Amino acid sequence: MKNWMYAFGMAAGLAVTIPVVAQQYVFDKKIALPGDGGYDYMAIDSVNHDLFVSHGTSFNVVDLATEQPIAVIDGLKGVHGIAFANVVNKGFISDGRGKAVVVVDLTTFEKVKTIELPAEDEDGIIYDPYSQRIFCFCGDSKSVCVIDVHTLELVKAIDLGGGPEFAVSDGKGLVYNNIEDQSSLKVIDVKTLAVKATYPLAPCGGPTGIAYDPGHQRLFSGCRANKGLSVVDAVSGKVITTLPIGAGVDAVVYDGADRLIFASNGDATTTIIRQESADQYSVIQTLATQPRAKTMAMDMKTKKIYLSAPQFEPGTRKIVPGTFAVYVYRPA
């Protein structure tokens, strides 16, 4: 979709309409990583400028200044995600098969503590700066476990009544969590540690990734069942609009500075959406990526996006050994 700027002719006094072409993304490079295990979330520690890539029983760490691997956090049982509490210089890894959250030092990458949880399938995990607590979402238990980043102790396990996927904090006292098996969104009050509201997301089905625009108080939920991205009013819960995206979405990122939304999809595409206003959106690019490259992180400094995936044998889900990598895309 074209946006329009208006320049006024000094001499003629006439308005001249000039089209502005939206920024396109292109492939930049591939960063090869060791190992042949499964993979899930990626996340960027913006303070230390490191990229963390989940990979089977370990996390690969990439220095974003050089875009080279610098460490491996291993000895885990089945990692999913990591959340950063830079206030204590610690990362919190969700270890689904270990039924725990593993705490690591963000400078040395050494394990500090394993926090065993009364839950199963630890998956999505975020840091809430308002409460200075970690929220670890546990799929099989249909709950979220809350951890104090200072004491490294479990504060409470909250029943969600459905299978949680990813979540986002508004930084002001609320956490929003996609409930995949109910096609809804839970609003969690971080002060009372209770579910405050439930927002139905229809026509969205099977919501996974989620991002938040604090300026317009809009939520962006990526939905697998209908291959759509739903824009939701965070205050009322109203679904404003739904945009078409690729199949198998897993991650959603919002770049507030450039007003762009990215949805990474398992069908070898990343859908890029332009935010025209709080309630108006348009798809501006379907970026060709890699098959099953469905997880993503964005460096807000460079505007690069990072997606991870191995190569697969044709027509199968069998991984070709030694092919796991991070694929980097940048503005053209």
What are the roles of these predicted feature ranges?
Residues 1-2:
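N-terminal secretory signal peptides that target proteins for export/translocation
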Residues 6-17:
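Bacterial N-terminal signal peptides
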Residues 15, 21-332:
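Predominantly soluble domains enriched in secretory-pathway, periplasmic, or organellar proteins
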